[in-house]
Amino acid sequence: MNDSKKTVHATVLGYPRIGADRELKRAVEAHWAGRRDEAGLEAAAAAIRSEMLDDLAAAGLDSVPTGVFSLYDHVLDTAVAVDAIAPRHRRENESATYFAAARGDATAAPLEMTKWFDTNYHYLVPEIGPDTEFRARPGKALAEFGEARARRLNARPVLLGPVSFLLLAKAADDAPEGFAPLDRIEELTAVYAELLSALVEAGAEWVQIDEPALCADRTEAEREAV
């Protein structure tokens, strides 16, 4: 008989990001209306993330997820992390670029929105073409990982996986006929390797890579891309 003790570890896959009293919604809307500047928006976001970490720490989890907060949409956050931003949305700073993609402005239409796997949540659809220049931009992932580490929490960065990201995307308007975003999987996985390297260098011992698209019916070619 094996008398060795088995340890059960507890964690959660993610955490609600809107705030206990919908603080994020009010802060973002105030920013759009010009009543809260960029620094004020980030202060509100930081307070929500702090409350989230308080709750996760109090739950006694063995590992807490980081990178699950978003000002608007986690798929858009992933597009920013790999620099897959449509040229029409690029602005003078990251915040302006982010919200141009999310909401559009006087000069550019926003990204399309569609249902997240037939749920009531809608995500922003990235636009990918043969000439999309992917680059690793790990700033958000590193910052939120660092916030948890500063509290001495066993933090686990969470990323939307490259296969799901491309399957959730659509071909850019100027892409040639027959092009599919998944055609860029090799280039994108190289950028993900850079993101992972940055997280490991910052102290991450493991990273949660979500591939929800694999829960749906897929073609053989799509499955092979994994």
Where are the language model's segments positioned?
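Domain-level signal for soluble alpha/beta catalytic cores
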Residues: 1-226
